[in-house]
């Protein structure tokens, strides 16, 4: 289970948003995230808001889709009553947890509720996450028939001892099969990898990258393992049972990923994400990084509309109680002030290749550009043309770049 909620104000039971949420809504895209908070087992490194069967306090997975639909319907009423104009949905993303633990009919039911309420924009991106051992060819075909366009498989590694440390439940041999089945169903394919697992060597990481690239995914994400407080992995490291990966090793892993992916024709478009073309970038995640609007459905889901951010109660039992009681599931919220929105803009947009317009920075930030070029943290040619774009070194030190641009 995830950590504590963010610090914010209590959310009203009716969920109504302040008038500021409606300002300039039509200049922002609108997406929907649907959180499915169920997993067969809890991986030792995972800090996401997920629950195994023994942690559900009597809540039934089979009831979840209907309750999520209740929130979708409530979202329509809340946005309308708050004066936020109705917009078609540009992206839909099912995350978790393991969304594909639910029957396809349940995912289709939730997607239909989104489509019926708001409509899907032309060419809308509809993604679900999946574990390689949670789907088969028939399931993936049914996803495509229901309107899904993309599947993101949690491959994580191709090396058995790394998967064992992460406590992943699939065999490496399963990944090529599910990719083949997804392709046959007409779905775009993304693979998620994790690097820096304790005990993982650079040769192990190379093997995982080469295996992933041999499958020719449209998109690949490579995330550094972050050891979160409260997880089993954190306890193992604290007790000395497992040795953590140091920062220099993490940098070596990242540099190898960028080298192999670039050689295979993948372009980085966000610090941890690469795609074969602009068309295969994750548009849903780009919406997060560029400050668009989205409604997050489900326990622990976060939403953002016009500078107003809120988050739902975490446990499925609490979520079920509020949905069946006709109350908003929001536990808290905050309205971002101008300085906070500006800091978040720099924090998020500096990570993407399209970058930040130099002219949009503060005077102090613009002055800092020259020293960032000198330190080889940003691309000199791009900066002189008016855009902040991180170099490879800058991607490794992205947090430092943000501090210097925003101080």
Task: Tell me what each language-model feature is.
Residues 385-391:
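Minor-groove-contacting beta-hairpin "wing" of winged helix-turn-helix DNA-binding domains
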Residues 35-50:
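Local cysteine-cluster metal-coordination motifs and their immediate loop/turn environment
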Residues 15-29, 49-363:
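C-terminal scaffold of the Radical SAM
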Residues 373-385:
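A short, conserved structural fragment
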Residues 392-407:
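Short, amphipathic alpha-helical interaction segments positioned at domain boundaries
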Residues 362-376:
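Short amphipathic alpha-helical interaction segments
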Residues 1-33, 40, 86, 380:
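Flexible, acidic/Gly-rich N-terminal and inter-domain linker regions that tether
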């Amino acid at each position: 289970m995830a950590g504590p909620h963010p610090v914010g104000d209590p959310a009203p039971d009716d969920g109504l948003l302040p008038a500021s949420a409606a300002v300039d809504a039509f200049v922002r895209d609108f997406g929907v995230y649907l959180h499915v908070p169920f997993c067969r087992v809890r991986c030792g490194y995972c800090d996401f808001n997920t629950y195994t069967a023994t942690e559900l306090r009597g809540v039934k997975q089979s009831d979840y889709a209907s309750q999520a639909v209740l929130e979708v319907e409530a979202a329509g009423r809340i946005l309308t009553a708050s004066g936020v104009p109705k917009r078609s949905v540009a992206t839909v993303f099912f995350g978790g947890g393991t969304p594909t633990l639910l029957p396809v009919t349940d995912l289709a039911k939730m997607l239909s509720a989104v489509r019926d309420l708001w409509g899907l924009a032309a060419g809308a991106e509809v993604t679900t996450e999946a574990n390689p051992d949670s789907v088969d060819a028939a399931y993936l075909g049914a996803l495509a028939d229901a309107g899904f366009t993309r599947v993101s498989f949690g491959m994580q590694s191709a090396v058995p001892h790394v998967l064992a440390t992460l406590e992943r439940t699939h065999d490496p041999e399963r990944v090529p099969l599910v990719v083949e089945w997804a392709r046959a169903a007409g779905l775009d394919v993304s693979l998620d990898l994790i690097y820096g697992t304790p005990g993982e060597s650079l040769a192990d990481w190379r093997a995982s990258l080469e295996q992933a690239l041999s499958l020719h995914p449209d998109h690949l994400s490579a995330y550094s393992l972050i050891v979160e407080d409260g997880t089993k992995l954190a306890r193992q490291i604290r007790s000395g049972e497992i040795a953590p990966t140091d920062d220099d090793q993490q940098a070596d892993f990242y540099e190898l990923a960028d080298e192999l992916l670039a050689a295979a024709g993948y372009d980085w478009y966000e610090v941890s994400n690469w795609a074969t073309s602009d068309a295969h970038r994750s548009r849903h995640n780009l919406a997060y990084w560029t400050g668009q609007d989205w409604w997050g459905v489900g326990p622990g889901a976060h939403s953002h509309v016009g500078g107003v951010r809120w988050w739902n109660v975490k446990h499925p039992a609490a979520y079920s109680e509020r949905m069946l009681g006709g109350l908003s599931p929001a536990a808290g919220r905050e309205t971002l002030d101008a300085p906070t929105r500006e800091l978040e803009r720099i924090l998020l947009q500096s990570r993407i290749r399209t970058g930040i317009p130099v002219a949009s920075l503060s005077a102090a930030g613009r002055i800092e550009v020259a020293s960032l070029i000198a330190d080889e943290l940003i691309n000199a040619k791009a900066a002189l043309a008016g855009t902040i774009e991180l170099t490879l070194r800058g991607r490794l030190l992205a947090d430092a770049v943000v501090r210097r641009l925003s101080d």
